[in-house]
């Protein structure tokens, strides 16, 4: 075989490789690559953004959600055994001795009067109650109660929970309180202490109102 023939065959093989690569790129684009670059991730995989950096309502948390963590609740485990315990117990989510993952609760945190002007945001954010609020909010996926671990774990929704099944269904009264909290953040552009969130109570008083769930 002459040198010329060998060079010709190598050139043809290289050209076939280039054509195959181009076809592969076009194939990726036809599978939903989107955008000007066919190797980019499709638009449908982009994470949604929150509008106005919304926050959950602190007033509703401290009056309605936090007390749930201290309730003696019946629990069912996968092996069929049952028990009665609190979420804030020392073996669960207690801030000092808990073993229940990142979610932590200070059980004896005291409520704060949000109608008292002396309780400024800085003072509230330094309190134990706010630490509980901050920890609980970290277990929330905005806009999704089923993806929020603060509900998904005690309901065993596609995730393990060492504390067993706490809420049988989304209709559990305590689960409904947490759902309402997740689904009703403070209005966009306001902070977690906004008086607009007081409508989550009937009457709209964070100190005396009852906790709405719908």
Kindly label every feature range from the protein language model.
Residues 1-64, 182-214:
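Post-cleavage N-terminal segment of exported redox proteins
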Residues 2-3, 36, 78, 127, ...:
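Intrinsic-disorder/low-complexity regions
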